[in-house]
């Protein structure tokens, strides 16, 4: 109940780019149904500041997400800072043993999800069909 009161009378701004305007509208519509007011802000590029951002992030095949989450990186768009996450990302980049590296990145993923620096809406799947 206290969380609901903290949003009472406030309008949240959802920033996005044109390609994701429909996704942002869907989020705004869902929030409206539960009484959360929001407005869309469609920009041409990644904004410097935002309340809520719906933006595509391409994750690498390798689990190293140093450029996305390490506090020293300009590409850390959420400005997230967590010393434990920083250390795991640093260790993962330098570890050569694949089993140890796997454990490091599993810990990174677990702590990142527990800390909630971002809400991951979905991971789209794209298919390409071609003739040989």
Report the location of each language-model feature.
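Short acidic low-complexity segments
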Residues: 39-48
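Structural transition elements
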Residues: 1-4, 16, 21
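N-terminal hydrophobic or amphipathic helices and topogenic motifs
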Residues: 1-8, 131-132
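Short glycine-rich hinge loops at helix-strand junctions in the catalytic core
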Residues: 35
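Detector for C-terminal structural segments
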Residues: 18-29, 48-132
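Short, well-ordered beta-strand elements
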Residues: 9-17, 38-39
